[in-house]
Regions:
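Core segments of cupin and vicinal oxygen chelate
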Residues: 1-50, 99-102, 157-187
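A broad, low-specificity signal for short, low-complexity segments enriched in glycine/proline
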Residues: 4-10, 23-30, 59-60, 114-118, ...
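Vicinal oxygen chelate
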Residues: 5-13, 42-45, 55-148, 151-160, ...
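Short amphipathic alpha-helices in soluble, non-transmembrane regions
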Residues: 21-26, 80-86
Length: 187
């Protein structure tokens, strides 16, 4: 399946104003009353914890309500629908995206990605084995620099059954584990 990555993470929170200020300070751009985006259009949605438009809360203290993954095309949305509807309800929403829950109860959605292609220079960093790009102790950015996150690149779930979660995402959706936290779970 051609899943590109998370397009949006949706939260239900106790203190909307503080959370909004945090993400603005982080560098996300306010798109509307609820949505805050990175340069490529991916981002987060912040709503009041009891907002009726949100998926049901998990029986934990997590504020995460839904992860919406961007996919390459409608054929991928259709393939995910066909695969996941074998053993669970999958809803098609008004915008053509689909919504369901994973094996641990997290609400997940899939849509044709909203990511915009970026054409930006790489950041000036020195890395082991690479040609030096800037002098030692030179600041890598201007002191007047305002951070602007480029993309929402990943989401981390801390779950009670990492093996079950990994199995769902790998076997049902084709995710590939690239790294692991010892005794915690996969990436």
């Amino acid at each position: 399946m051609n899943i590109i990555g998370p397009d949006k993470i949706v939260f239900g929170v106790d203190d909307v104003a503080t959370c909004q200020q945090f993400v603005i300070d982080y560098g996300l751009v306010q798109q509307d009353d609820y949505n805050y985006v990175a340069l490529d259009g991916t981002g987060i949605e912040i709503r009041q914890i009891d907002d009726p438009s949100l998926p049901a809360a998990l029986p934990t203290s997590t504020m995460l309500r839904k992860t919406i993954y961007g996919v390459a095309d409608q054929a991928t949305v259709d393939a995910i629908y066909a695969e996941l509807s074998k053993d669970r309800e999958v809803k098609t929403l008004e915008d053509g995206s689909i919504e369901t829950v994973d094996d641990l109860g997290f609400a997940i959605g899939f849509q044709i990605t909203i990511r915009k292609e970026l054409d930006l220079p790489a950041e000036m960093v020195n890395a082991p084995g690479a040609k030096q790009k800037r002098a030692v102790n030179d600041i890598g950015v201007s002191k007047d620099f305002t951070p602007k996150p480029r993309s929402l690149s990943h989401v981390v779930y801390f779950v009670p059954d990492a093996v079950k979660a990994e199995k769902f995402y790998a076997e049902r959706l084709g995710f590939v584990t690239t790294d692991r936290f010892t005794n915690t779970g996969p990436f």
